[in-house]
Structures are given as structure tokens and as C-alpha cells.
Amino acid sequence: MKTFSAKPAEVTKKWIVIDATGLVVGRLATLVANRLRGKHLPTYTPHVDCGDHVIIVNAAKVVLTGRKRENKVYYHHTGFIGGIKERTAKSILEGRFPERVVEKAIERMIPRGPLGRMQMGNLRVYGGPDHPHEAQQPEPLNVAVMNRKNMRAA
């Protein structure tokens, strides 16, 4: 029996929606990264974008365990000399774009390269409860019931 290798034309992509209210960031990110890559499928092929389209709503209501909300620091560089900037997870979650915490967690679990960028394009994260993708009829995925550790009281 030969090893199965999916062709891009054979891949069928589903749309799933996840409500992130009260979910632990790292556990949510691992599950979503595997879904984006297609590793949950028996037909997974490493060089083909065979993952699903994932919509995450209520990303502003995610939970960080321990003291990570106050202590976790996100760095970026402006490109100028001495231009390293830092922000805590708390300041990002309370700021203008709270969904960036979830996006960065997932982005850092996806391989860097052309295929990884394409797979990250299948991710949509919204801070509030609404999303404009009702026409795609996304299936809800309840992450909280998969494992009791996935959910924390805020």
C-alpha cells in the first residue's frame, strides 16, 4: 500500500467557530493551530494546506493561568536603534485590539514560511461576539467540553 498524499484540489475545507469565553489561551491556541494545519485529519499532508477555516469570537474574554496576565511580556522592535518595545498581556487585553494575544499564540505555533502564512490566512479572530461569516455556515466547536482543563473561571 502506498503512502497517501493529498492534492490541493482534493482538499475539502470546513468552517468552524469557537467561542473563546473563559478558555485558557495556550490550550485554545494548540487546538486551533492543529485545526489550521489539518493535523486532526487522517488525510494530513505536510506540504498541502488541508486545514479548516477557524473563526474565534469573544477573544477578549480569554484567560491566562497563573500570573501571566500581569507578568507575560510581548516584545516588538520599531526598526530603529534602541527601538525595542514591550507590553504586558494585561495591557493588550484591555487595549484596542485584545484579539492579538490569541493571534500571536496561534501564530507562534504555526511553522514559519509560505505555507504557514497561507494557513494563518484561514484564521479570523474577533474580540466581540459577532462575526461577518454567517454565509459560510460555520459549525460550532465546543472546546470547553473536550477537557476540563480547557476552561477557567475568569
Swiss-Prot record:
Keywords: Ribonucleoprotein, Ribosomal protein. The keyword DNA damage does not apply. Disulfide bonds: none annotated. Transmembrane segments: none annotated. GO terms for biological process: negative regulation of translation; translation. It comes from the Bacteria. It holds the Pfam family Ribosomal_L13. InterPro entries: Ribosomal_uL13, Ribosomal_uL13_bac-type, Ribosomal_uL13_sf. GO terms for molecular function: mRNA binding; structural constituent of ribosome. GO terms for cellular component: cytosolic large ribosomal subunit. SUPFAM superfamilies: Ribosomal protein L13 (SSF52161). The keyword Ribonucleoprotein applies. Part of the 50S ribosomal subunit. Belongs to the universal ribosomal protein uL13 family. HAMAP family: Ribosomal_uL13. This protein is one of the early assembly proteins of the 50S ribosomal subunit, although it is not seen to bind rRNA by itself. It is important during the early stages of 50S assembly. This is Large ribosomal subunit protein uL13. It comes from Rhodopseudomonas palustris (strain BisB18).
